[in-house]
UniProtKB/Swiss-Prot annotation:
Coiled coil: none annotated. Binds 2 Zn(2+) ions per subunit. The gene is pyrC. It comes from Pediococcus pentosaceus (strain ATCC 25745 / CCUG 21536 / LMG 10740 / 183-1w). InterPro entries: Amidohydro-rel, DHOase, DHOase/Allantoinase_Hydrolase, Dihydroorotase_CS, Metal-dep_hydrolase_composite, Metal_Hydrolase. Zn(2+) 2 binds at D150, H177, H230. It comes from the Bacteria. Catalyzes the reversible cyclization of carbamoyl aspartate to dihydroorotate. It is an enzyme of class 3 (hydrolase). This is Dihydroorotase. Signal peptide: none annotated. One of its GO terms (cellular component) is cytoplasm. One of its GO terms (molecular function) is dihydroorotase activity. Belongs to the metallo-dependent hydrolases superfamily. DHOase family. Class I DHOase subfamily.
Amino acid sequence: MKVLLKNARVIKSHQVQKTDVLVENDRITQIQPEINVEAEQIIDVKNQLLMPGLVDIHVHFRDPGQTDKEDVVSGSAAAVKGGFTTVLTMPNVDPVPDTPEKMTAMVKHNQTAGSLHIGQYGSITKKRTSEELVDFKALKEAGAVAFSNDGNGIQTAETMYQAMLQIKEVGLPLAAHVEDESLMQHGVMNQGTVAEKLGLPGISELAETAQLARDLEIARNTGAHYHVCHVSKARSVELIRRAQRDGVHVTAEVAPHHLFLDETMISMDNPMMKMNPPLRTLEDRQALLGGLLDGTIGMIATDHAPHTVKDKAGSMKTASFGITGLETAFPLLYTKLVKPGLCTVEQLVEWMSIQPAEIFNLKAAGQLEVGDVADLTVMNVEDEYEIKEADFASKGINSPFIGQKVYGQTQLTMVAGKIVYQREG
């Protein structure tokens, strides 16, 4: 099967080039200014951006256990509609993938039900909430690509110390949800004047920064690859930057909502603005962008967390934490960062494809050269459109960005040479 993509602006080798791309079966076989061959499909890309498929190392597909919120089929549909060709799914499902048997079953289900490359996290501890460590070697052999207890922090230093020692031996990243539960105080948003004004319980910044400081010292001691999920505080960026300068093997991600939303935008008790970590201050938001631009934070990850309408109804006091993100990430980032000149589109592709693939050792992802697996995405960045809940492929419509006008709509997504999404019209 040959697919010829004509008249593309291709993002490769850190620059944009006007060229054609030929795909044969699952591989890129030619990248030339003008390719004239017979092919089963010839698609005129019409000068739109063609880039390596996007990579999201932090998503929640809720499958198994909460498939009323999302499942592998609907999550995959949302991912490819957002331009993603590889995602890593978190282990806060039921049953938790904490044994080789459960991991094997999840990997098989992801492969058969999904329409893109899906990597599976194993949990760090049994059932994710205990202090008993899993068998990391056995889970890796069963298909785990990394380990996390996302949704909960590791509450004791000894457990985290032993986890890092053992995970280092298997050579995979430990992705940490940094949260000291003793400092959460049943909060639902950032602790501060806005929470006080709204009469809502706040979450102290120490819930994140105190556990992060602990973990960075453990990572320094063990030499493990310690990855920080959804960084939300300026102080966290500072701690990570200092540890990196000292040679600690620490990497970090930031979510789009923490880059573009802050507590000052919460003018009422609005469950759509409830997420964990919470939306912080304007100064925190600016520091996160600074950390992204200077390389302290190496990637953007959505923390795609779909919920039912019922879960996100009522008050922030009772609604679930979380926001969908796979279908809105690229357009929001392109519109709010690239369009105003805060970064280049090449940098955005680094953060959303190349670097997450490199940092998590996803060897077939984030590539666009002859001989590479044909995981490709075409984006229309010229025409404005409105984010509408009716257009979501995800089961979750819990997004505060609905109604915003953006640029960067996915036109085509190809996974291993197969077109898995193509926008009608």
